[in-house]
């Protein structure tokens, strides 16, 4: 049913536009082979187990673009084969669709839908800092947004998103999240392009044994220092209410949240740093957490066909049971990942990556380490362009 919902959404905007002779329509099939060595596939702190993993991927990308509409459908199947732990072999599925439509010169509407089936224990590591079990997860997510230009200087924004994670055997890890966001930006008359920002957000998280409601308001600025350097800064209060399903006991907490994003772009080098603090929920933990994150990405082109990249991710997930959170948690996850990419031609490219990860449980005072290395070869060829 979830797969059909995603594909039905895509057909609603792709097929009618094709009949109307779109300005730009592309169909791009792709295939990839990834060979990986992982020295701690279960992220164990006392019984590390290594393995070689082969991942064969096949996918299809369909893109549609006209003066008023942008649409995309991306599908991919990954076949995972473990050299020693064959019981972990799996087929992972990914489906993603998006559509954006310019209703008039002032109003733009967009929608996204996604469905995936995955099982790797590190599937969320780069996003949340969490390590999961190898239980099969079925995820569906949907979002809708509207941008309205109220005047030459003022814009309004609103969005709604829904995420549902269901696991094949473990109910404890299941999670449903909903987010509502409204915002306003206004350009200011400064010498450099600057905009004031005001956002309000409501989030509802439904876990196995608890529910959490979080309310936040942030105010800040975005500013373009130069053609190469820009920043975004937001900060504001939040109020959190958590309740246990079994006892209906409710607790409350409050604090600050926000973000700082710096972006640098030039011809050969791009860099971005994002620092944020928020209350959020995700699958793999029975309760919300206060998450503080640092994400740094640096990319440099060293030749016409080659580039290097350095990624650093660090997430601290904290929760105190007496403060609107269901469990005690104090965990720091840090990863370092240098990589090299080479393009043989526009259709074929390869990537070599090393990734080191350390997870520190600051409650129990112990660490888990993992080294991962992989080489990936990708082929993509537009059959309709």
What does each model-found stretch correspond to?
Residues 21-385:
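Gram-negative and organellar
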Residues 1-26, 382-385:
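Cleavable N-terminal export/targeting peptides
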């Amino acid at each position: 049913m979830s797969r059909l919902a995603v594909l039905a959404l895509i057909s609603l905007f792709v097929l009618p536009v094709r009949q109307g002779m779109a300005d730009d329509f592309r169909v791009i099939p792709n295939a990839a082979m990834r060979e990986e060595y992982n020295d701690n596939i279960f992220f164990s702190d006392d019984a590390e187990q290594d393995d070689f993993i082969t991942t064969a991927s096949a996918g299809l990308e369909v893109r549609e673009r006209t003066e008023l509409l942008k649409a995309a459908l991306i599908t991919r199947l990954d076949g995972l084969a473990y050299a020693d732990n064959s019981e972990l072999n799996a087929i992972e599925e990914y489906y993603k669709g998006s559509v954006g439509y310019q209703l008039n010169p002032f109003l733009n509407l967009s929608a996204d839908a996604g469905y995936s089936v995955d099982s790797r224990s590190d599937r969320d590591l780069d996003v949340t800092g969490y390590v999961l079990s190898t239980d099969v997860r079925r995820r569906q997510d949907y979002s809708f947004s509207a941008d309205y230009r109220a005047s030459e200087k003022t814009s309004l924004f609103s969005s709604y998103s829904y995420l549902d994670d269901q696991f094949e055997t473990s109910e404890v890890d299941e999670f449903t999240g909903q987010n509502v966001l409204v915002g306003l930006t206004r350009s200011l008359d400064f010498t450099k392009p600057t905009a004031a920002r005001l956002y309000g957000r409501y989030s509802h998280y439904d876990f196995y044994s608890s529910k959490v409601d979080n309310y936040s308001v942030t105010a800040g600025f975005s500013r373009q220092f130069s053609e190469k350097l820009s920043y975004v800064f937001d900060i504001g209060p939040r109020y959190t209410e958590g309740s246990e399903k079994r006892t209906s006991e409710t607790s409350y907490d409050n604090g600050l949240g926000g973000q700082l994003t710096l972006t640098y772009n030039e011809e050969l080098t791009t860099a971005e740093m994002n620092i944020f603090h928020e209350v959020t929920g995700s699958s793999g933990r029975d309760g919300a957490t206060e998450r503080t994150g640092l994400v740094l990405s640096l990319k440099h082109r060293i030749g016409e066909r080659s580039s290097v990249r350095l990624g650093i991710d660090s997430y601290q997930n904290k929760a105190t049971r007496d403060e609107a959170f269901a469990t005690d948690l104090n965990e720091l996850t840090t990863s370092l990942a240098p990589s090299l990419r080479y393009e043989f031609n526009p259709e074929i490219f390869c990537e070599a990556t090393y990734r080191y990860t350390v997870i520190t449980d600051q409650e129990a005072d112990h660490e888990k380490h993992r080294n991962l290395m992989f080489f990936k070869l990708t082929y993509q060829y537009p059959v309709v362009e």
